């Protein structure tokens, strides 16, 4: 069932690299748990910092974190004081030296994680879910996305019975492995309960060799061919008849 497949996991090792990059002989569960705790702490600590995802690289004595964010100034702070404070906090948690790199996301409207977070914040502020979803879709298409799908599930609008609503525009291929699909899901905690928000953004097709090393932001994208217009309306059929009549 293609619609049930996680687009990120399906493309790992093909066109998508890993967010955790390290090697361990026998301590893998503990390190994996520490990675999860680091990501949860950073998401809570930088809730207003526009944090999309965290790439973790490890050496025996050092941890390198790359924070992909749309608001680097909020994370770095004036004169770098905020990022130094964050580094000291993470050092106490991990008992290792921590190096933090901040990478700016130029187009947050095309980042699935940031789009989902934005919709979740609007739902928590009691904005209409339809308005939030349609605004996000129009912004992504305007910024160059080939297709986008957004799904919200829960007690939408305070309804007694939970339901699922989704909006889609453009192409969102689920089984094309060369399709660059950015996927994320988040949760909006409203007064009526939790609402799940899932976002799929199709950015284009990647052709050729792909560099799967960490922190590679630029990817080679193949522009998809424009769809050919097929069929036609009443006016099109009438114009074809007129052309045939003139030729006769």
Annotate each predicted stretch with a short phrase.
Residues 1-248:
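RNA-contacting regions in translation and RNA-metabolism proteins
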């Amino acid at each position: 069932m293609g619609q049930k497949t996680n687009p990120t996991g399906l493309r790992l090792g093909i066109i998508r690299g890993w967010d955790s990059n390290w090697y361990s002989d026998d301590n893998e569960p503990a390190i994996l748990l520490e990675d999860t705790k680091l990501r949860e702490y950073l998401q809570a600590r930088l809730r207003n910092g526009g944090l999309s995802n965290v790439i973790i690289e490890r050496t025996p004595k050092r941890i390198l974190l790359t924070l992909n964010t749309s608001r680097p100034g909020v994370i770095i702070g004036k004169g770098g004081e905020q990022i130094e404070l964050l580094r000291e906090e993470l050092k106490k948690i991990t008992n290792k030296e921590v190096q933090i790199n901040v990478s700016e996301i130029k187009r947050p409207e095309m980042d699935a994680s940031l789009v989902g977070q934005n919709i979740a914040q609007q739902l928590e502020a009691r904005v209409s879910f339809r308005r939030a979803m349609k605004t996000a879709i129009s912004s992504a298409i305007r910024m160059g996305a080939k297709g986008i799908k957004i799904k919200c599930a829960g007690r939408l609008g305070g309804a007694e019975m939970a339901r699922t609503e989704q909006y889609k525009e453009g192409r969102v291929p689920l089984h094309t492995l060369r399709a660059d699909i950015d996927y994320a899901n988040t949760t909006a905690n409203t007064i009526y309960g939790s609402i799940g928000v899932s976002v799929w953004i199709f950015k284009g097709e990647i052709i050729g060799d792909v560099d799967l090393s960490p922190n590679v932001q630029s990817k080679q994208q193949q522009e998809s061919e424009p769809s050919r217009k097929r069929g036609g309306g009443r006016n099109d059929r009438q114009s074809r008849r007129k052309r045939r009549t003139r030729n006769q």
